[in-house]
C-alpha cells in the first residue's frame, strides 16, 4: 500500500485546527484525523480590534510538532485562513504595526469615498469583487491615512495565510485565491491593479505577483530535521471549501456555512455586468482558473455572538427548543452592516425587530429562531439572484463546512429555497486544502478527480424541500406580494 500524509492548517475566525490526512493511493481513500484544535477570536489592542497572530503561530507549530512526535513522515503542509486581513513586515521580516482584524471600525466611510472618487462601476470592472466595507483596499487606505508614521518602515504586506507560510519557511508568497478577496487584483491580468493600489495608498513593491494554487513555497524543518514542503494551497478557506464541495454538474450551487455563509457557483468566466454589480456579486479566484461567483452572507457570526453573550453551552438543546417555535415571527437582514460587530448582538437584533414593528425576540430560542429563519430567507433571495444572473435555475445546493451540521437550518434552507440540499463534508476547507496538496504531489489529476474521492469518502446527508412548511408558505406569500406590486407598477 502507498500512503501520503498531508497536514492541513485550517484557521477560521473563531477556531483553528491542525488536521492530518492519510491518502491511500490504491483504493483512493482519504481519512482525516484532528491533531490539534484551538480557539481564535478578536482582541482589543491599542484601540484596534486585532488578531493574536503570535498565539496562532504557536498553536500551528504545536500541532505540527505533535504529528512529528508520532513518528509520522509528513509529505506536505498547506495553510488556509479567512480573507482580506494582512500583516505588514519591514525589510528584516519583522512586523510593523498591529495585525488589525476586518471587524475593526477603522474603514468606516472609506468604501463610499472610493466609489465617489474612482467610480463604483470602474472598481467593479477592474476587480470583479463584491463591495464590502472591510475589503483590504479600504483597510490599506485606513492604514495610510490614519497611521502615516508606519509607511516608511513597511517593506512587505502578506495576507494572513501567506504570513504563516512565511513564518514556517522564510519564503514569501502571495497566493491568488486569497489575493482576489482584497479587491486589489485586476480580474483580467490576475495581477495587482495599479489604479486600485494607488487609491489604497499602498506601494506596489509591498506585494509580489499572485501565484495560483499548487506551487511549493518553501520548506519547514521539522524537529527531526526533515525538510517538509509547504504548498500554496487555495489559501482562502472558502476557495478550499469549494474544491471539496462534491458539485455534480452545472446546476449545482454551494453554500460554505460557518462564521460567514458564502453562496455561489463555479464558472469558467466572471460575471461583471450591470446585473452582477447591482446584486453585489463577487468573482473570487478559484483553483484551476475557475471563478467562485458568489455572495457573502453574514452567516453564523450572529449566532456565535448570541451564544457568547447569553453564555449558552448546549447548542443541540438550543436548536431543539428553537425548532419547537413557529417560523418567521422575527425577521432581520443578517447582511445589515449593523451586525458586523455591534457592542451587543442580542440588543442589536432586538432593536432591528423593534424598528420594523415586529415582535421582539426575548428568549435564547427566539433569538436563534430569528437568526435561522432570517438566514434561510436570505439564502433563498441570494440563490434566486444567482440563478437570474446566469440564466439557469439550480437543481441542488451543497452546504459544506461546520454550519452544515445544523439540521434545522439545512431543512429551513431546503424549504425556503425549494431545492434539494446535500449537507457535507463538514471539514470542507481542510479537505480542499489537502486536495491541492495531493495534486501537487501528483497523486490526483485535478479538482474533479478529487471531488470523486470526496463523494465516496465523506458523510453526506440529503434534505428534501417541504412545500407545506411554514417558511415555504412565507416565501410563497412574499413572491406573490412582489408579483402583485410589479403588475401594479
From Swiss-Prot:
InterPro entries, per database record: ATPase_NBD, FGGY_C, FGGY_N, Rhamnulokinase
Active site annotation, chain numbering: 237
Signal sequence segment: none
Biological process terms in GO annotation: glycerol metabolic process; rhamnose catabolic process
Cystine crosslinks: 68-222, 353-370, 413-417
GO MF terms held by the record: ATP binding; glycerol kinase activity; rhamnulokinase activity
Record: residues binding ATP: 13-17, 259, 304, 402
Positions contributing to substrate binding: 83, 236-238, 296
Protein name: Rhamnulokinase
Native source organism of the sequence: Escherichia coli O6:K15:H31 (strain 536 / UPEC)
The organism's taxonomic lineage, starting at the top: Bacteria, Pseudomonadati, Pseudomonadota, Gammaproteobacteria, Enterobacterales
Amino acid at each position: 500500500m502507498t500512503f501520503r500524509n498531508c497536514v492541513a492548517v485550517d484557521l477560521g475566525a473563531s477556531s483553528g485546527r491542525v488536521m492530518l490526512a492519510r491518502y491511500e493511493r490504491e483504493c483512493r481513500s482519504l481519512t482525516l484525523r484532528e491533531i490539534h484544535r484551538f480557539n481564535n477570536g478578536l482582541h482589543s489592542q491599542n484601540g484596534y480590534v486585532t488578531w493574536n497572530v503570535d498565539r496562532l503561530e504557536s498553536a500551528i507549530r504545536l500541532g505540527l510538532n505533535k504529528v512529528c512526535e508520532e513518528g509520522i513522515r509528513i509529505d506536505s503542509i498547506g495553510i488556509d485562513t479567512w480573507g482580506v486581513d494582512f500583516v505588514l513586515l519591514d525589510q528584516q521580516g519583522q512586523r510593523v504595526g498591529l495585525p488589525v482584524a476586518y471587524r475593526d471600525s477603522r474603514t468606516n466611510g472609506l468604501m463610499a469615498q472610493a466609489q465617489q472618487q474612482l467610480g463604483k462601476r470602474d472598481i467593479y470592472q477592474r476587480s470583479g469583487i463584491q463591495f464590502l466595507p472591510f475589503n483590504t483596499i479600504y483597510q490599506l487606505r485606513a492604514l495610510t491615512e490614519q497611521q502615516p508614521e508606519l509607511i516608511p518602515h513597511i517593506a512587505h504586506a502578506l495576507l494572513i495565510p501567506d504570513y504563516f507560510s512565511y513564518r514556517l519557511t522564510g519564503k514569501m508568497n502571495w497566493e491568488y485565491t486569497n489575493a482576489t478577496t482584497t479587491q486589489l487584483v485586476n480580474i483580467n491580468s490576475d495581477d495587482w491593479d495599479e489604479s486600485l493600489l494607488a487609491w489604497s495608498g499602498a506601494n506596489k513593491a509591498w506585494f509580489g505577483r499572485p501565484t495560483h494554487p499548487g506551487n511549493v513555497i518553501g520548506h519547514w524543518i521539522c524537529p527531526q530535521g526533515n525538510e517538509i514542503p509547504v504548498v500554496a494551497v487555495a489559501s482562502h478557506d472558502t476557495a478550499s471549501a469549494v474544491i471539496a464541495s462534491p458539485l455534480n454538474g452545472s446546476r449545482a450551487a454551494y453554500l460554505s456555512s460557518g462564521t460567514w455563509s458564502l453562496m455561489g457557483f463555479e464558472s469558467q468566466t466572471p460575471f461583471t455586468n450591470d446585473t452582477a454589480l447591482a446584486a453585489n456579486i463577487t468573482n473570487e479566484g478559484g483553483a484551476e482558473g475557475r471563478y467562485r461567483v458568489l455572495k457573502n452572507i453574514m452567516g453564523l457570526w450572529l449566532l456565535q455572538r448570541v451564544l457568547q453573550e447569553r453564555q449558552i453551552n448546549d447548542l443541540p438543546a438550543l436548536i431543539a427548543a428553537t425548532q419547537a417555535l413557529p417560523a418567521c415571527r422575527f425577521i432581520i437582514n443578517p447582511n445589515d452592516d449593523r451586525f458586523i460587530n455591534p457592542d451587543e448582538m442580542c440588543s442589536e437584533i432586538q432593536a432591528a425587530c423593534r424598528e420594523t414593528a415586529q415582535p421582539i425576540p426575548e428568549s435564547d430560542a427566539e433569538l436563534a429562531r430569528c437568526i435561522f429563519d432570517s438566514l434561510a430567507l436570505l439564502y433563498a433571495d441570494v440563490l434566486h439572484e444567482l440563478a437570474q444572473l446566469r440564466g439557469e435555475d439550480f437543481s441542488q445546493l451543497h452546504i459544506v463546512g461546520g454550519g452544515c451540521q445544523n439540521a434545522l437550518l439545512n431543512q429551513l434552507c431546503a424549504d425556503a429555497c425549494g431545492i434539494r440540499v446535500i449537507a457535507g463534508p463538514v471539514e470542507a476547507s481542510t479537505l480542499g486544502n489537502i486536495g491541492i496538496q495531493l495534486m501537487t504531489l501528483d497523486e490526483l489529476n485535478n479538482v474533479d478527480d478529487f471531488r470523486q474521492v470526496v463523494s465516496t469518502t465523506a458523510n453526506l446527508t440529503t434534505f428534501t424541500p417541504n412545500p407545506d412548511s411554514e417558511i415555504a408558505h412565507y416565501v410563497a406569500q412574499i413572491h406573490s406580494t412582489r408579483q402583485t406590486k410589479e403588475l401594479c407598477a
